[in-house]
Amino acid sequence: MMEKYHETDADLKDLSGKTIAVIGYGSQGRGQSRNLKDSGLNVIIGIRAGKSRDLAKSDGFETYDVAEAAKKGDVIMILVPDENQAAVYKAEIMPYLTENKCLMFSHGFNIHFGQIVPPANVDVIMVAPKGPGHMVRRTYEEGKGVPALIAIEQDHTGNAKKLALAYAKGIGATRAVVLETTFREETETDLFGEQAVLCGGVTSLIKAGFDTLVDAGYAPEMAYLEVLHEMKLIVDLIYEGGFTKMREAISNTAQYGDITRGPRVIGNESYEAMREILYEIQSGEFAKEWILENMVNRPTFTALTRADEEHLIEEVGSELRAMMPQFKKN
């Protein structure tokens, strides 16, 4: 079983007197930084000039170029996109990564796949909230928190776990639960979840269901409502209480169809495809493919994204959502 940590297991004093340099001010950067600041910790932002820097300033932070922030920081949390981290690290962080500093991540991709190789005389840790930045912030403001993972790759100072737990407490994660993992486990399971289930699996399943109904002559609007719009209702129930709560809330007809037809949709071929996807992640094949894709300016990424944006389900969804008051901006 995984080690689990809560409020009493972490102490913000382990970060007192230290400067936390958060590199990047996107969704996670903004959410984590504001929580840390409101927890009484000293946070600065390392970011290039632009709208995000202006936003960080308006949120009350001291902002610096990345190199200057890395120089000032005792703890350096890298929250720029995965594909940019290695270049930013080599050019603007590595020269200032002196002994006993702490290098921190919220995803293990670049450490696990060797794109960033820190010196041996620093701590290398991960604190990974299991939710987007706006949720990290919102739950904190509500007096709650999102769960998080911590991992220790290097413990040069002997205090790496204390720092990880203190940071997790600073962003509100110990109000929920903090689980200890490894960079390898977090990276491989996170990528698999995104590709096979949460993003790739769900979107492909929805499109397949939509296309099946439309090809059979049903109205695209009906297909959209049945396979996409109602998805949130089901997922919310599962999120709140697992499959049991969801099945308690649906009709007996729906439940019978669920337990007898679902395994025909996600059958042996799907399991085999999932195993292949997991192997591509474990072997580094996916990482290599994604790194090379970025080196040539993402032609496949751009083409496939454009194709999905032009799918009929997006056109129909846009029209229907425009009629629904819950999606109208005030």
From Swiss-Prot:
Binding site for NADP(+): Y25, G26, S27, Q28, R48, S52, D82, E83, N84, Q85, G133
Catalytic class of the enzyme: oxidoreductase
Protein name: Ketol-acid reductoisomerase (NADP(+))
Residues annotated as binding substrate: S251
Residues reported to bind Mg(2+) 1: D190, E194
Pathway: Amino-acid biosynthesis; L-isoleucine biosynthesis; L-isoleucine from 2-oxobutanoate: step 2/4; Amino-acid biosynthesis; L-valine biosynthesis; L-valine from pyruvate: step 2/4
One of the record's GO cellular component terms: cytosol
Active site: H107
Organism: Methanocorpusculum labreanum (strain ATCC 43576 / DSM 4855 / Z)
Pfam families, alphabetized: KARI_C, KARI_N
PROSITE patterns in UniProt: KARI_C (PS51851), KARI_N (PS51850)
A GO molecular-function descriptor: NADP binding
Taxonomic superkingdom: Archaea
GO terms (BP aspect): isoleucine biosynthetic process; L-valine biosynthetic process
Co-factor remark: Binds 2 magnesium ions per subunit.
EC number: 1.1.1.86
Reactions the enzyme catalyzes: (2R)-2,3-dihydroxy-3-methylbutanoate + NADP(+) = (2S)-2-acetolactate + NADPH + H(+); (2R,3R)-2,3-dihydroxy-3-methylpentanoate + NADP(+) = (S)-2-ethyl-2-hydroxy-3-oxobutanoate + NADPH + H(+)
Keywords: Amino-acid biosynthesis, Branched-chain amino acid biosynthesis, Magnesium, Metal-binding, NADP, Oxidoreductase
Signal peptide location: none
Functional description taken from the UniProt entry: Involved in the biosynthesis of branched-chain amino acids (BCAA). Catalyzes an alkyl-migration followed by a ketol-acid reduction of (S)-2-acetolactate (S2AL) to yield (R)-2,3-dihydroxy-isovalerate. In the isomerase reaction, S2AL is rearranged via a Mg-dependent methyl migration to produce 3-hydroxy-3-methyl-2-ketobutyrate (HMKB). In the reductase reaction, this 2-ketoacid undergoes a metal-dependent reduction by NADPH to yield (R)-2,3-dihydroxy-isovalerate.
HAMAP family associated with the record: IlvC
UniProt record similarity statement: Belongs to the ketol-acid reductoisomerase family.
Record lineage: Archaea, Methanobacteriati, Methanobacteriota, Stenosarchaea group, Methanomicrobia
